[in-house]
C-alpha cells in the first residue's frame, strides 16, 4: 500500500500518550486512528502494529517509539506512543519526540499510579506545556461517585506538579469499546470528544522561525579582506544582514553586527531556522569567538553555570557506565556544540546513581554556557556519552 502524502494545509502539532503501564495508552492510540479513519483523517492501526515499536537510537540511547499520524478537521498530528516505561523516560529526557502537548491516560478502575505521577513530573521537568486527560476503562466502574473521586485525584496530582488541574479537560471513555465500534457515550463519541479537547486546549506551537534568533557556533574562520565568519546551523529565528547579535557563553557576552550571511558560498540577505550558514561579524577577530558559543538576538539568552536538571544515565547495554557514580562526580556536559566540565550534586537522600537510572541533579559548570529551561544536553566522559539530560531550572 503506497503511503499517502499528507498535504500540509493544516497546522501541525506533536503530541503523545503518557501514563501508567496497562492503563490503555496504546489501545487509545489505536482507537484514535480507528475513529478518525471513518472521516478519512487516519489509517487505522491495530494495537499490535503500534505495540511492536521499532527501536531507534537517539544520542546513543536505545528507545522504542511508535509514530502515528492522523488529522482532525483543524489540524495534522504526529503522535508518539512508547511500549515501555523506560522508553517514555528516555524519550522525554532526550527530547527525541518533542511534544507540544500530551494525552495522559488514567484507568478509572485503578486511579493514578506511580508512573502516572512520574510521567506528570517528567512532563513538568522537560517542558511538555499542555496535558489533556483521557479517563479510560470507565465501563469497569458502575459507581459515578467513584469516577468523580478518581477525577479529583487526577486534578490534585496535576496541580501538585504545577499544571492547571482545575482547567485541564478530562474526557471519560473506553478505548476498548471505541475499538469494538461501540457508539454509546463512552465508545467512539468519547474519542471524538477527546480529539475536540486536544484541538482546542493544546495551542498551535510557535514556529521555529518566529522565535528569537539563535545559532550555535560550530566553527570560526578568518577570511582575508572580509573579516571573521562564524558558521553553524540556525536553531531558531531569522537573522537579517545588518542586525545586531550577541555572542553568548564561555566568555563575557559581546555585541556585534552581522554584516553578511552566506550559504553554499552564495550571499543571502537572511538566514533562517534550519539553514547552515556562515555569518560575517563586524569588529571581532577569529580569536574573539569559539565553538560552543551562540549567536543570539540581544537579550534573548544568558550564560549560566548552575542549573537543575533531569538526567537519564545510560545502562551498560547502551554503552554507558558499568558502575554507579557518587556525589562530586565530574563529567563533561555537552551543550549544542561543545563539552564543558561540571560537578554533580545529588538529591539529599541519594548516595549513588546506577546505570539505567533517571534522576534530578544539580550541576555547576566551570565555564558559563548560553542556556535556558528545556535545553537538552549529553553527559560525557572523555567523548563517550554516558547520559542524557534536560535543564529543568536555572539556578544562577
UniProtKB/Swiss-Prot annotation:
One of its GO terms (molecular function) is GTPase activity. GO terms for cellular component: cytosol. The keyword Protein biosynthesis applies. Residues 60-64 are annotated as: G2. Residues 19-26 are annotated as: G1. It catalyses: GTP + H2O = GDP + phosphate + H(+). Residues 10-206 form the tr-type G domain. It is found in: Cytoplasm. GTP binds at residues 19-26, 81-85, 136-139. Residues 174-176 are annotated as: G5. It is an enzyme of class 3 (hydrolase). Disulfide bonds: none annotated. Its EC number is 3.6.5.3. It comes from the Bacteria. PROSITE patterns: G_TR_1, G_TR_2. Its main location: cytoplasm. Residues 81-84 are annotated as: G3. Monomer. NCBIfam families: EF-Tu (TIGR00485), PRK00049.1 (NF000766), PRK12735.1 (NF009372), PRK12736.1 (NF009373), small_GTP (TIGR00231). Belongs to the TRAFAC class translation factor GTPase superfamily. Classic translation factor GTPase family. EF-Tu/EF-1A subfamily. GTP hydrolase that promotes the GTP-dependent binding of aminoacyl-tRNA to the A-site of ribosomes during protein biosynthesis. This is Elongation factor Tu 2.
